[in-house]
Curated annotation (Swiss-Prot):
Keyword Transferase found: no
Chief place where the protein resides: other
Gene coding for it: tlp
A Pfam match: Tlp
Name recorded for this polypeptide: Small, acid-soluble spore protein Tlp
Residue ranges, compositional bias (Basic and acidic residues): 46-60
Organism: Bacillus subtilis (strain 168)
Lineage: Bacteria, Bacillati, Bacillota, Bacilli, Bacillales
Amino acid sequence: MTKNQNQYQQPNPDDRSDNVEKLQDMVQNTIENIEEAEASMEFASGEDKQRIKEKNARREQSIEAFRNEIQDESAARQNGYRS
């Protein structure tokens, strides 16, 4: 293996330092998506309204999972990312 090929074999180090912030951004973006979807329901057909409601329910579940992950990552950060 040449030197160039070998440099591509090495994995990137695990950098969790900004995970909380990324997850918070994901929560905010998902909330905005819910709000935009709800606004679009005014112009949607009955079938589309049902799809939007179902998708927003899944988005709410995602937000809950993101918030749980934020708590986990925040605790890990406070513990210096030790197991």
